[in-house]
Structures are given as C-alpha cells and as structure tokens.
C-alpha cells in the first residue's frame, strides 16, 4: 500500500460516506470555489474598504494612475518590467477609481478562475475534473495571498484552459499561451512543449507569430514600440534574489555571518538580494544556465517524441519540466513563481490522476512552505532567522526534487516505446 493509498484509507475512516460522496459531486466544487474566494474577498476588504491595496497591487495602481511613459517615471520602477499586455488588466482594475483598485483586481482574477474551473469540470472532465478542481482550491488556499495580488493570478487560469485543450485544439492553445506570454513571460515554458509535441506545431508556431504581430502593431499605434522588449533587459543587472534556489548557500552564509555575507534590499527593483563571496558571479551565470536548462529540456522532449511518446502526456510532463526549470535556474525566485506550476499539475491530474499524484503532493508541500515564507514570516527570513532559512531551504529542495521527477518521467516516456515507429513530425 502506497502513502497515497493510506491517505485514502484514513479519509474513508475519518469522513462519513455521505461527506465523501458530496465532495465527488460537480456542484460541491462550486461551493468550495465560493468559500475560498469569499474568504480572500473578506480578507482583502480590510484593505479596499479603506481605499488601500495589498502587496504588488499598490505598484499596479501607481502605474495605472501615472501612465506608462518612462519619461514621466522620475526614477520610479518602470512598468515595462512586464510584457506589454500586462497593461490591460493593470489599467482595467482602475476602472472604478483608485480606492477600489484592489477589489476590481480581485474580481478580474476571480472571474478568470471561474472560467478555468468551468472548463476543468465540463464535458469529458465532468467527473475526472472534480478531484483536480479540489486540489486547485486547496492550492489556492495557500497561494491566494500571492495569486490575488500578482499578475500571475491573471495568467494561471489562461494557461490552465490552454493545457486542457492543447491535445484537441493546439492552435487555440497556442493563441492563449502566446497572449499569456505577453502578459508574463513564464507561459512560454508551456508553449514550447506544446509546440514540440503537437502534430500541428507549424500552425501553433504561426499562431504565436500572429499574436506577437498584433501585440507589436497595437504597441506601435499607442506609441510604446520602443519599449516593447524592455522586460527582457530591465532586470538584467539584478543580483541573486533571496528566495532563488541557487541563493540557498548565501542564505546560510548570511545566517552565520560568514565572510561578510548578508541579505539587503535592492530598492531600485523592490527586492531582497543576497550578497557574499561569489554571489555576483552566480548572478551572472544564472541567465546562461537557464538557457542551457531550457535547451536541454527541449532536446529531451524531441528525443521522447521521436521514440514514440504519447503526445498529451509528453507536453504535460514537458511543461512541468520546463516550468520547474524556469524556477530552479532563475536568479529571481519570487514566491509567486510557485503559482506557475499550478495549472500544469491541475491539467496533469485531469489527464491521469495516478501518474500525477506524486508531483501534486510535492507541489502542495512547496505551496505550504511558501505560505510560511510569505505572507506569514517573511520579515524573520530577511533578517536571516535560522528557522526561516531552514523552511526556505526545504522549499528549494522540494523544487529540485520536482524538477528531478519531471526530467526522469519525461526521459521514461522516451524509453518506453524505443521499438515503436517514430511519430510523424
């Protein structure tokens, strides 16, 4: 009996049969959705009822009121750190005025989540989508303090819908993922595996080109074309952020105050970074390491496809591998990056619950430790508290384990059918 089988046994003993049956009904998921979202709405009401915002939405509100002309920023953080389509939800949230900015921002994300849940639990997934939907709600309970206050909350449900339909409608998925990439870059880590695994990869590629052309045209017409690629360079000189996986050695050097190592704020980009022997070299190397990791993942995907891997499983596990690599080999490592993994796991669980329950458990552990880090005890962490350093280290180790799992399973997809005739590419 596996660990997960034991959990099911415990659940059956603890919960009455009627309760278990209720959780298996499609309607129960919507009740759960309402409870989770009403909780976060109530919590955020303590801010927006006073005309305040929470976390990054304060920066978004400032951009929405000040505009997007870099010449008018006067040393402030540039809004062009995000791809240009992020401007749409950022400005839309100001439609009811600055005092209700947080409320409108929350409602936008809640609406997108509702659409994502609808697609997850309709048609052929009316039954198989229920358990993944509950997993999503529990994940949101831990990550909601981040997802309802970050652009990631906008992109995550869009990526989920794209993954749910990538097998049967890859071009539609390509369009959705391309749009999401122009809001926040990370969906590109999902678009690449979908393109590799799809029989319609050429059409998927040109759907992305078409979206990019429309975005470029719109940006040119609005007078911002000169800044359309600023998001690729605006943060290029930043150091190793505290939460990044590869920052872990300097976190502990800071805890024990070895060789002048420390954690300090980078006020220019509003982040906390680690400083110490070799930290600058590590920051310089992270970009090429990330590129190499992405190339290695792409090669592994192509290899598996040529050996007859099942396409839907390939782009799902490939997406998990690529997105996790984007996090592990990233010198930023912000807590909200964990949100990126949610849509991939949810789509994977809907495709094959048994195969995906291990990474789902790993990600839930990552979400729990991230919740302890932010919003609960971020201040002790930036003051080098050893207990919080241990929590962060645990989170980072779990991320590495998740990356290892995804690489291993993707490689296995390529080995299972070595005798099969290669698929038409």
Task: Please state what every model-predicted region is.
Residues 2-233, 284-425:
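Multi-pass membrane glycosyltransferase architecture that uses lipid-linked
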Residues 225-259, 281, 332-337:
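Alpha-helical transmembrane segments and terminal signal-anchor/GPI-anchor hydrophobic tails
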Residues 62-65, 76-99, 240-278:
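Short hydrophobic/aromatic helix or loop-helix immediately within or flanking a transmembrane segment
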């Amino acid at each position: 009996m596996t660990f997960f089988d034991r959990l099911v046994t415990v659940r059956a003993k603890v919960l009455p049969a009627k309760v278990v049956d209720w959780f298996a009904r499609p309607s129960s998921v919507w009740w759960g959705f309402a409870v989770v979202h009403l909780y976060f709405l109530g919590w955020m009401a303590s801010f927006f009822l006073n005309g305040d915002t929470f976390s990054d939405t304060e920066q978004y509100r400032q951009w929405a009121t000040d505009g997007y002309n870099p010449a008018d920023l006067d040393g402030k953080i540039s809004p062009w750190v995000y791809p240009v389509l992020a401007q749409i939800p950022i400005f839309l949230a100001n439609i009811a005025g600055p005092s209700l900015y947080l409320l409108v921002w929350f409602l936008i994300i809640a609406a997108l989540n509702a659409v994502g849940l609808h697609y997850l639990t309709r048609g052929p997934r009316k039954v198989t989508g229920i358990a993944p939907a509950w997993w999503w709600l529990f994940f949101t309970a831990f990550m909601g303090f981040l997802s309802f206050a970050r652009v990631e909350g906008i992109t995550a449900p869009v990526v989920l819908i794209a993954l749910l339909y990538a097998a049967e409608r890859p071009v539609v998925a390509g369009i959705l993922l391309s749009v999401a990439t122009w809001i926040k870059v990370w969906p590109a880590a999902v678009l690449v595996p979908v393109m590799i695994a799809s029989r319609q990869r050429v059409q998927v590629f040109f759907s992305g080109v078409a979206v990019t052309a429309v975005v470029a045209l719109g940006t040119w017409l609005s007078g911002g074309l000169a800044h359309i690629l600023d998001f690729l360079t605006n943060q290029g000189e930043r150091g190793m952020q505290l939460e990044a996986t590869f920052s872990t050695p300097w976190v502990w050097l800071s805890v024990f105050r070895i060789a002048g190592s420390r954690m300090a704020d980078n006020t220019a980009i509003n982040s906390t970074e680690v400083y110490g022997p070799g930290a600058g070299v590590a920051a310089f190397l992270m970009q090429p390491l990330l590129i190499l990791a992405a190339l290695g993942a792409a090669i592994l995907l192509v290899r598996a496809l040529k050996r007859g891997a099942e396409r839907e499983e390939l782009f799902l596990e490939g997406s998990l591998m690529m997105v996790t690599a984007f996090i592990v080999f990233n010198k930023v490592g912000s807590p909200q990056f964990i949100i990126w993994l949610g849509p991939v796991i949810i789509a994977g669980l809907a495709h094959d619950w048994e195969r995906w329950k291990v990474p789902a458990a790993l990600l839930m552990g990552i979400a729990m430790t991230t919740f302890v880090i932010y919003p609960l005890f971020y201040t002790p962490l930036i003051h080098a508290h050893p207990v919080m350093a241990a929590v962060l280290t645990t989170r980072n180790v779990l991320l590495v384990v998740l990356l290892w799992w995804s690489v291993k399973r993707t490689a296995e997809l390529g080995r299972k059918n070595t005798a099969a005739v290669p698929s038409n590419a």
